Amino acid sequence: QRYHTAPGESYQMDWGFVEVENASGSTYKVACFAMICHCCGQRYIEFFPNAKQENLFIGMIHAFLYMGIPEHVLTDNMKSVVIRRDEQGHPIWQKDYELFMGNLGFETKLCKPRHPFTKGSVERLVRFVKDNFLPGRVFSEITDLNYEAIRWCNTQNSIYHRAVDCIPNDKHTMFCMKNASVLEESIELSYYLCPERKISFDGFVHYEGRRFGVPYWYTEKTCRVKRDGYILYIYDSKMTKVLTSHDVTWSRRDSFCKEQYVTEQPEERPTAPVKVQIQQLNPPPYDSGFSKFNFEEGLWDE
Protein backbone atom coordinates (compact mmCIF):
# COMPACT_ATOMS: atom_id res chain seq x y z
CA GLN A 1 0.00 0.00 0.00
CA ARG A 2 1.37 3.40 -1.01
CA TYR A 3 1.84 5.91 1.78
CA HIS A 4 2.50 9.65 1.77
CA THR A 5 4.79 11.87 3.81
CA ALA A 6 4.79 15.60 4.46
CA PRO A 7 7.29 17.89 2.69
CA GLY A 8 10.75 17.58 4.20
CA GLU A 9 9.66 14.73 6.46
CA SER A 10 11.26 11.65 4.91
CA TYR A 11 14.07 10.69 2.55
CA GLN A 12 14.91 7.15 1.49
CA MET A 13 18.42 5.83 0.84
CA ASP A 14 20.01 2.66 -0.51
CA TRP A 15 23.05 1.22 -2.26
CA GLY A 16 23.16 -0.21 -5.76
CA PHE A 17 26.05 -2.01 -7.41
CA VAL A 18 27.31 -2.10 -10.98
CA GLU A 19 30.05 -4.10 -12.67
CA VAL A 20 32.76 -2.18 -14.52
CA GLU A 21 34.95 -3.62 -17.27
CA ASN A 22 38.26 -1.79 -17.54
CA ALA A 23 40.51 -1.33 -20.57
CA SER A 24 42.39 -4.57 -19.88
CA GLY A 25 39.17 -6.60 -19.86
CA SER A 26 39.07 -7.38 -16.13
CA THR A 27 36.01 -6.43 -14.09
CA TYR A 28 35.35 -4.93 -10.68
CA LYS A 29 32.32 -3.50 -8.85
CA VAL A 30 31.51 0.05 -7.84
CA ALA A 31 28.80 1.14 -5.42
CA CYS A 32 26.11 3.72 -6.20
CA PHE A 33 24.70 5.65 -3.24
CA ALA A 34 21.14 6.82 -3.89
CA MET A 35 18.86 9.12 -1.88
CA ILE A 36 15.42 10.47 -2.78
CA CYS A 37 12.87 12.76 -1.16
CA HIS A 38 9.73 10.68 -0.70
CA CYS A 39 7.42 13.69 -1.04
CA CYS A 40 8.64 15.26 -4.30
CA GLY A 41 11.08 12.79 -5.87
CA GLN A 42 14.15 15.05 -5.63
CA ARG A 43 17.06 12.64 -6.14
CA TYR A 44 20.80 12.40 -5.59
CA ILE A 45 23.27 9.69 -6.62
CA GLU A 46 27.02 9.29 -6.15
CA PHE A 47 29.44 6.50 -7.00
CA PHE A 48 32.11 5.07 -4.69
CA PRO A 49 34.70 2.28 -5.01
CA ASN A 50 32.88 0.43 -2.20
CA ALA A 51 29.94 0.70 0.19
CA LYS A 52 31.89 1.07 3.42
CA GLN A 53 30.45 3.14 6.25
CA GLU A 54 32.80 6.07 5.64
CA ASN A 55 31.46 6.34 2.08
CA LEU A 56 27.88 6.09 3.38
CA PHE A 57 28.56 9.11 5.59
CA ILE A 58 30.17 11.05 2.71
CA GLY A 59 27.28 10.21 0.37
CA MET A 60 24.68 11.23 2.96
CA ILE A 61 26.45 14.52 3.69
CA HIS A 62 26.69 15.36 -0.02
CA ALA A 63 23.00 14.49 -0.45
CA PHE A 64 22.04 16.68 2.54
CA LEU A 65 24.07 19.55 1.10
CA TYR A 66 22.19 19.06 -2.17
CA MET A 67 18.64 18.72 -0.76
CA GLY A 68 18.64 19.56 2.96
CA ILE A 69 18.24 17.38 6.05
CA PRO A 70 14.83 15.72 6.59
CA GLU A 71 13.19 14.70 9.86
CA HIS A 72 14.11 11.08 9.21
CA VAL A 73 15.74 8.78 6.66
CA LEU A 74 14.18 5.43 5.75
CA THR A 75 16.57 2.61 4.92
CA ASP A 76 16.96 -1.14 5.21
CA ASN A 77 18.96 -2.99 7.86
CA MET A 78 22.48 -2.10 6.70
CA LYS A 79 25.42 -3.29 8.79
CA SER A 80 26.69 0.30 8.73
CA VAL A 81 23.44 1.49 10.33
CA VAL A 82 22.09 -1.09 12.79
CA ILE A 83 23.64 -3.99 14.71
CA ARG A 84 20.46 -5.85 15.64
CA ARG A 85 17.08 -5.38 17.29
CA ASP A 86 16.32 -5.93 20.97
CA GLU A 87 13.59 -8.15 22.40
CA GLN A 88 10.96 -5.47 21.76
CA GLY A 89 12.08 -5.03 18.16
CA HIS A 90 13.79 -1.68 18.75
CA PRO A 91 16.97 -1.10 16.72
CA ILE A 92 20.37 -1.12 18.38
CA TRP A 93 22.25 1.37 16.25
CA GLN A 94 25.83 0.95 15.13
CA LYS A 95 27.68 3.34 17.48
CA ASP A 96 29.34 5.47 14.78
CA TYR A 97 26.08 5.82 12.87
CA GLU A 98 24.23 6.79 16.05
CA LEU A 99 26.81 9.51 16.67
CA PHE A 100 26.46 10.62 13.04
CA MET A 101 22.68 10.99 13.45
CA GLY A 102 23.17 13.08 16.59
CA ASN A 103 25.77 15.35 15.02
CA LEU A 104 23.69 16.07 11.90
CA GLY A 105 20.29 16.15 13.62
CA PHE A 106 18.07 13.57 11.92
CA GLU A 107 16.46 10.26 12.81
CA THR A 108 16.47 6.93 10.99
CA LYS A 109 13.60 4.53 10.40
CA LEU A 110 14.21 0.95 9.31
CA CYS A 111 12.28 -1.30 6.96
CA LYS A 112 11.03 -4.54 8.41
CA PRO A 113 13.56 -7.34 7.83
CA ARG A 114 13.13 -8.87 4.36
CA HIS A 115 10.68 -6.09 3.37
CA PRO A 116 12.81 -3.85 1.10
CA PHE A 117 9.71 -2.76 -0.85
CA THR A 118 8.85 -0.51 2.11
CA LYS A 119 11.36 1.95 0.63
CA GLY A 120 9.96 1.59 -2.87
CA SER A 121 10.89 5.10 -3.99
CA VAL A 122 14.63 4.57 -3.66
CA GLU A 123 14.35 1.00 -4.98
CA ARG A 124 12.79 2.44 -8.14
CA LEU A 125 15.48 5.13 -8.27
CA VAL A 126 18.27 2.53 -8.19
CA ARG A 127 16.52 0.58 -10.93
CA PHE A 128 16.03 3.79 -12.95
CA VAL A 129 19.74 4.60 -12.62
CA LYS A 130 20.62 1.15 -13.95
CA ASP A 131 18.10 1.42 -16.81
CA ASN A 132 18.51 5.10 -17.72
CA PHE A 133 21.85 6.53 -16.58
CA LEU A 134 24.22 3.55 -16.82
CA PRO A 135 23.48 1.75 -20.13
CA GLY A 136 26.27 2.49 -22.61
CA ARG A 137 28.05 4.69 -20.10
CA VAL A 138 31.81 5.02 -20.68
CA PHE A 139 34.07 6.81 -18.21
CA SER A 140 37.78 7.12 -17.45
CA GLU A 141 37.71 7.82 -13.72
CA ILE A 142 35.09 7.59 -10.99
CA THR A 143 35.45 11.36 -10.56
CA ASP A 144 34.25 11.82 -14.16
CA LEU A 145 31.41 9.39 -13.49
CA ASN A 146 30.26 11.45 -10.52
CA TYR A 147 30.36 14.70 -12.51
CA GLU A 148 28.12 13.02 -15.08
CA ALA A 149 25.90 11.66 -12.30
CA ILE A 150 25.24 15.08 -10.76
CA ARG A 151 24.44 16.52 -14.20
CA TRP A 152 21.98 13.65 -14.70
CA CYS A 153 20.40 14.39 -11.30
CA ASN A 154 20.06 18.08 -12.16
CA THR A 155 18.32 17.16 -15.42
CA GLN A 156 16.00 14.61 -13.84
CA ASN A 157 15.10 16.99 -11.00
CA SER A 158 14.15 19.67 -13.53
CA ILE A 159 11.60 17.69 -15.56
CA TYR A 160 8.08 16.48 -14.82
CA HIS A 161 7.71 13.02 -13.25
CA ARG A 162 4.29 11.40 -13.38
CA ALA A 163 4.94 9.23 -10.30
CA VAL A 164 5.05 12.31 -8.06
CA ASP A 165 2.98 14.55 -10.38
CA CYS A 166 5.43 17.44 -10.18
CA ILE A 167 8.80 18.83 -11.20
CA PRO A 168 10.95 17.75 -8.21
CA ASN A 169 13.08 20.92 -8.09
CA ASP A 170 10.05 23.19 -7.99
CA LYS A 171 8.17 21.31 -5.29
CA HIS A 172 11.29 20.68 -3.22
CA THR A 173 12.21 24.38 -3.24
CA MET A 174 8.67 25.62 -2.56
CA PHE A 175 7.61 23.12 0.09
CA CYS A 176 10.20 20.57 1.26
CA MET A 177 13.02 23.02 2.00
CA LYS A 178 10.71 24.99 4.29
CA ASN A 179 10.75 22.02 6.65
CA ALA A 180 14.12 20.44 5.86
CA SER A 181 17.17 21.77 7.70
CA VAL A 182 20.13 23.35 5.95
CA LEU A 183 23.37 21.51 6.65
CA GLU A 184 25.85 23.91 8.23
CA GLU A 185 29.62 23.46 8.06
CA SER A 186 31.25 22.27 11.28
CA ILE A 187 34.40 20.55 12.52
CA GLU A 188 32.39 17.34 13.01
CA LEU A 189 31.30 17.52 9.38
CA SER A 190 34.88 17.89 8.16
CA TYR A 191 35.90 14.78 10.11
CA TYR A 192 33.26 12.71 8.29
CA LEU A 193 34.34 14.08 4.92
CA CYS A 194 38.00 13.33 5.73
CA PRO A 195 38.28 9.73 6.96
CA GLU A 196 41.15 8.74 9.22
CA ARG A 197 43.96 6.58 7.85
CA LYS A 198 46.94 4.82 9.41
CA ILE A 199 50.33 5.58 7.87
CA SER A 200 52.29 2.52 6.77
CA PHE A 201 55.91 1.88 7.74
CA ASP A 202 57.04 3.03 4.28
CA GLY A 203 55.16 6.33 4.44
CA PHE A 204 51.90 5.68 2.56
CA VAL A 205 48.18 5.85 3.28
CA HIS A 206 45.72 3.56 1.56
CA TYR A 207 42.59 5.20 0.12
CA GLU A 208 40.09 3.97 -2.48
CA GLY A 209 42.35 1.12 -3.52
CA ARG A 210 45.46 3.24 -4.01
CA ARG A 211 48.49 4.33 -1.98
CA PHE A 212 49.48 7.96 -1.47
CA GLY A 213 52.70 9.25 0.09
CA VAL A 214 52.94 11.27 3.31
CA PRO A 215 55.90 13.61 4.11
CA TYR A 216 58.57 12.01 6.30
CA TRP A 217 58.58 14.90 8.80
CA TYR A 218 55.00 14.16 9.86
CA THR A 219 55.62 11.82 12.79
CA GLU A 220 52.11 10.87 13.93
CA LYS A 221 50.72 7.44 13.13
CA THR A 222 47.42 8.61 11.59
CA CYS A 223 46.24 11.34 9.25
CA ARG A 224 43.04 12.28 7.41
CA VAL A 225 42.36 12.18 3.68
CA LYS A 226 39.83 13.82 1.39
CA ARG A 227 39.30 13.50 -2.35
CA ASP A 228 37.99 16.73 -3.84
CA GLY A 229 37.48 16.34 -7.57
CA TYR A 230 40.80 15.35 -9.11
CA ILE A 231 42.90 16.21 -6.04
CA LEU A 232 43.49 14.13 -2.91
CA TYR A 233 44.36 16.17 0.18
CA ILE A 234 46.15 14.67 3.18
CA TYR A 235 45.64 16.49 6.50
CA ASP A 236 47.13 16.04 9.93
CA SER A 237 45.03 14.04 12.39
CA LYS A 238 43.44 17.17 13.91
CA MET A 239 42.62 18.82 10.56
CA THR A 240 44.76 21.87 11.32
CA LYS A 241 46.88 21.85 8.14
CA VAL A 242 47.33 20.21 4.76
CA LEU A 243 50.38 17.94 4.75
CA THR A 244 50.45 17.34 1.00
CA SER A 245 48.22 16.79 -2.01
CA HIS A 246 48.17 14.32 -4.90
CA ASP A 247 46.70 14.33 -8.39
CA VAL A 248 44.16 11.51 -8.47
CA THR A 249 44.92 9.67 -11.69
CA TRP A 250 43.32 6.37 -10.57
CA SER A 251 46.49 4.58 -11.59
CA ARG A 252 47.34 1.53 -9.51
CA ARG A 253 50.89 2.81 -9.07
CA ASP A 254 51.94 4.33 -5.76
CA SER A 255 51.77 8.12 -5.70
CA PHE A 256 54.83 9.68 -4.04
CA CYS A 257 54.97 13.16 -2.55
CA LYS A 258 57.68 15.72 -2.03
CA GLU A 259 59.75 15.12 1.13
CA GLN A 260 58.37 11.64 1.55
CA TYR A 261 61.73 10.09 2.39
CA VAL A 262 64.64 12.53 2.57
CA THR A 263 65.10 16.26 2.56
CA GLU A 264 66.36 17.69 -0.71
CA GLN A 265 70.00 18.77 -0.36
CA PRO A 266 72.09 21.30 -2.30
CA GLU A 267 74.07 19.65 -5.08
CA GLU A 268 76.88 21.06 -7.20
CA ARG A 269 76.78 20.69 -10.98
CA PRO A 270 79.60 21.07 -13.55
CA THR A 271 80.02 24.65 -14.70
CA ALA A 272 82.12 23.64 -17.74
CA PRO A 273 82.10 20.68 -20.14
CA VAL A 274 83.53 17.52 -18.53
CA LYS A 275 86.49 16.33 -20.64
CA VAL A 276 88.19 13.72 -18.42
CA GLN A 277 86.87 10.19 -18.87
CA ILE A 278 87.72 6.94 -17.04
CA GLN A 279 86.61 3.37 -17.65
CA GLN A 280 84.65 1.01 -15.43
CA LEU A 281 84.83 -2.78 -15.89
CA ASN A 282 82.37 -5.45 -14.90
CA PRO A 283 83.15 -6.84 -11.43
CA PRO A 284 85.02 -10.20 -11.31
CA PRO A 285 82.96 -13.37 -10.78
CA TYR A 286 81.93 -13.76 -7.19
CA ASP A 287 83.70 -16.55 -5.28
CA SER A 288 81.62 -17.56 -2.30
CA GLY A 289 84.36 -19.69 -0.73
CA PHE A 290 82.28 -22.84 -1.13
CA SER A 291 83.46 -23.60 -4.67
CA LYS A 292 86.20 -25.92 -3.36
CA PHE A 293 83.58 -28.26 -1.93
CA ASN A 294 81.88 -31.02 -3.93
CA PHE A 295 78.62 -31.26 -2.07
CA GLU A 296 77.14 -33.90 -4.38
CA GLU A 297 79.95 -36.38 -3.59
CA GLY A 298 80.67 -35.14 -0.09
CA LEU A 299 84.34 -34.65 -1.08
CA TRP A 300 86.83 -31.86 -1.35
CA ASP A 301 87.83 -30.54 -4.77
CA GLU A 302 91.60 -30.70 -4.63
Where in the sequence are the language-model features?
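Acidic/histidine-rich, metal-coordinating catalytic segments
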Residues: 69-89
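Active-site beta-loop-alpha junctions of metal-dependent nucleic acid enzymes
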Residues: 45-70, 249-255
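Active-site-proximal acidic segments at structured loop/helix or strand boundaries
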Residues: 126-226
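Mobile-element integrase/transposase regions
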Residues: 1-43, 51-55, 102, 190-207
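Protein C-terminal end segments and domain termini
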Residues: 229-302
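RNase H-like two-metal-ion nuclease catalytic core shared by retroviral integrases
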Residues: 75-76, 87-88, 108-130, 145
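Two-metal-ion acidic nuclease core segments, chiefly of the RNase H-like superfamily
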Residues: 90-108
